[in-house]
Amino acid sequence: MKISHIPEHIEQLTIMNVPEYYKLNNNHALIVRSKAETDFWLKTHYGFQVMNGHVFYTETMTDFQAEVQLRMNPNSKFDQAGLFVMISEKCWLKTSLEYIPDGPSHLGAVVTNNGYSDWSTQDFPTELANEQLRFRIVRKRGDYTIYVKKIHQWEQIRITHLMEDIGNKPIKIGFYTCSPSKNNGFETEFLEFTTENI
């Protein structure tokens, strides 16, 4: 059964790292403002370890499909919003648009296994960074397929595996936002978030 979490079941979601604020607007979308200097990244290339981004999540033990529809209003480099899946702090993935003011922005995914993150990207026109985007993650037996919907068509952007996903831990599934820069955070309008066991 597909569950729509915005606006009907927001109160059933758990928050990881409370954002600057969140509220429902007149269109029944959830507005979330990130805090500055927030991110999800472990070790690789940059050397730092940061796990303080904001996630609104539910949990499952089964295969699933999750989707989010959102509109960002970014203002600083690497402002980002999308979908997030976590098995543990050393095993997780995120997919999002990451804003680059002088463009192009990055559309892609970060996958973290054994405490090391990797990052795959494709260019995305920065002038479209505040347009509506949809992200989808499908889990099948520990394997994850990541999609993005640009305009009217779904596009597969990654297939990956989470090494700790062996069926013995709850899987956190949610939408997320963060602002790695030292500037102010930014607002994202989350219009829809659905999960479905498959």
Locate the predicted segments by residue.
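Extracellular glycan-recognition regions
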Residues: 1-198
